Amino acid sequence: MNDRLQGVQAADGAAVAAADIPKAVTAGRLVYADGATQVFTTDGQTTYSERGGDSAGEWYVDDHGRFCSFWPPSYRACYALRWLVEDTRIVGLRFTGLRDGVTFEGRYA
């Protein structure tokens, strides 16, 4: 298990509690199915990297306890965040867009 997630109780597919979102997203670099990667930092910044290019954005937990991101100049999106757990080990996160229902998974590298 990722050391930063020690003490977190998680089941596969369970919602990430609002209080655990910062710990969950900053626990390590996430790798997506298409090979893109993303890093979230504790100061609310994020960098998404794909095909040799980087995009800088921001992340936050909104007043409703949801994970949200902002990509300048104007794109905002909020997601339902769920744990990916295999053999009792937290291996990543599942994001589902609240606006469009699109789901994607990121695995800790």
Task: Please describe what each predicted stretch is.
Residues 1-58, 62-109:
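Lipid interaction determinants
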